[in-house]
Amino acid sequence: MRILQLHCDRIEYSPVKKEIAAAEEPATGGKLEDAVLAFVAVEKGDGPGEAARAAAELRQALGRIGCKKLLIYPYAHLSSTLAAPSIALGLISEMEAALHDLEVSRAPFGWTKSYTISVKGHPLAEGFKVITGDARGTGAPKALESESSMKSTWHVLTPDGNMTDASEFDFAGCPKLKALARYEASKKRGTDEPPPHVALMKRMGIADYEPASDAGNMKFFPNGRLIKSLIERYVTERVVEYGGYEVETPIMYDSNHPSMVSYFNRFPARQYSIDSEGKSLFLRFAACFGQFLMAGDYQLSYKNLPFRLYELTRYSFRREQSGELVGLRRLRAFTMPDCHAFCTDMAQAVREAGVRFELSRDVIGQLGLDAADYEMAIRLTEEFYAENGGAVREMVRRHGRPVLVEMWKERFFYFVLKWEFNYIDGAGKASALSTDQIDVENGKRYGIEFVDENNGRQHPVILHNSPSGAIERVIYTLLEKAAADSARGTKPELPLWLSPVQARIIPVGEELVRNATELAKEMAGHGIRADVDDRNESMGKRIREAEKEWVRYILVVGEKEAASGRLSVRDRRTGKSTEMGLDDLVEAVREQTAGKPSAGLNSPFYLSKRPQVML
């Protein structure tokens, strides 16, 4: 932020012409005598921290001069790296509010203005200041600072409907819920040590950091891309089955679009911003923007509601703090299944939330998480709970375990209810997976309307649901769960339908590679991902490597198996080998992968043809 400060005998200004669409209305001129004029340019990266320090420095300067009149004058010509107008206006307004005890006024923002000034002649009459970020960086946006200072109360709601203050609840028997409560109380999101999944994602050839990109942007190797695509397909199939219309929307939006300004002002420092042909754009952090704008293109009747739009965003972007970025747990670019339901009123929204709650429970379970693997949190206003407490308690009853509740006296966000399933890792860090929100603001903000039973026009209540959470975070959760299993002495594994290789065929000798190949192709015809370890390595080494890659079924093909057509199948779970027919193996795999999408191998058929990933 840059400020040119002038102590003036007289200041007179008048708005002449609008410069931008977001210019303030109404715009009036003014005349002041014996006042300090502060020309202010807000720059990219500025936040409330800079606004607060600028206000403090102006206060000190006026104190030294002995003047109590101040005119804040937006003045773009002091910098070539200006912030988006929506951000600049917000920060200048914050400066004005911080100096409310002075005789402070502000020239209208976004206008070409004529002005006349007469500057006094004393040593302190003129000054220039550059306000930069403090040691913590560029400061958080107002909404985030307000969020961090918000007062809420914490409770635990049990399946029998009892609400207890969290400080008085007996967490014995609920260690993960206790960890979630501690995590929320501490507000510490960083980590001191890399969680176990980081080593696993590299060793398993799933994903790794990309130094050539921004932090929090990952690269996925063939194994990781296969796992990720299968999860994406499954979640999408379930949402479409539920009634979602799958759509696709842009990844970037105009920061100054009328529908975006108030929304974007909530979290400006968390966005990637880019300039294009004079436009200030930001990269979406969810599918909300595109889906809300698209909903406005529809002619909706109450008969069409709930109206459900769905998009799998590849990608959503959020500039999380660098100290919070770790592995697949928290990223700056991520894949998010995002389904919005537009409802007639709160009653319909509450009913729809119940349907989506069950959808999310089932999806997260089918992805490989048991109910005991995650903890539930609910955030809501006192008013919403007073009016809809029965529905909230029913949700907790169906969850079947105590739930952490954060209750606000007043609504700060656009939603009145938000619930989420949180995975608690070995370090006690919580990561939200499935979630839903009841939004009472954005229907009006985006001009979304439907015709009610009386032919009146109404704004819908909107639900924001991700039945799984970010796809990358699902993979993180599965790897962390596998690491925890390993620490307990259980063999780590992925769900069979997500295993990059479900069966590995190991021929005893080179002369049996052809038999192994025919068997693998036959298995592929039944939807089983099978490969052939044709390398000139010992049988023991090849079996050990298959175990290290978490291959569930290991088939050894010798002369006996080639002649009889029977299979010697080693189940990695038990470590035991069993003789069976191909039909038996196919049936076993089908039972474990029923209802899930299938795909072929995403790497060469023969292990001898595969290059090694050096991680």
From Swiss-Prot:
Q: Where along the chain is Zn(2+) bound?
A: C288, H340, H464
Entry's SUPFAM superfamilies?
Class II aaRS ABD-related, Class II aaRS and biotin synthetases
Q: Which family does it belong to?
A: Belongs to the class-II aminoacyl-tRNA synthetase family.
An annotated GO cellular component of this protein is: cytoplasm
Cofactor or coenzyme needed: Zn(2+)
- Which CDD domains does this chain map to? ThrRS_anticodon
EC assignment: 6.1.1.3
Which segments carry the region annotation Catalytic? 196-495
Localization (cell): Cytoplasm
Domain note: The N-terminal domain is an archaea-specific tRNA-editing domain that hydrolyzes incorrectly charged L-seryl-tRNA(Thr). Catalysis of tRNA editing is performed by the charged tRNA itself.
Q: Name one Pfam family in it.
A: tRNA-Thr_ED
Query: Self-association or partners: how does it assemble?
Result: Homodimer.
Q: Which UniProt keywords apply?
A: Aminoacyl-tRNA synthetase, ATP-binding, Cytoplasm, Ligase, Metal-binding, Nucleotide-binding, Protein biosynthesis, RNA-binding, tRNA-binding, Zinc
The record describes the protein's role as:
Catalyzes the attachment of threonine to tRNA(Thr) in a two-step reaction: L-threonine is first activated by ATP to form Thr-AMP and then transferred to the acceptor end of tRNA(Thr). Also edits incorrectly charged L-seryl-tRNA(Thr).
What note does UniProt attach to the cofactor annotation?
Binds 1 zinc ion per subunit.
Which BP terms from GO are recorded? threonyl-tRNA aminoacylation
Mind telling me what this protein is named?
A: Threonine--tRNA ligase
Q: Which reaction does it catalyse?
A: tRNA(Thr) + L-threonine + ATP = L-threonyl-tRNA(Thr) + AMP + diphosphate + H(+)
Annotated GO molecular function terms are: ATP binding; threonine-tRNA ligase activity; tRNA binding; zinc ion binding
Q: Where is this region: Editing domain?
A: 1-132
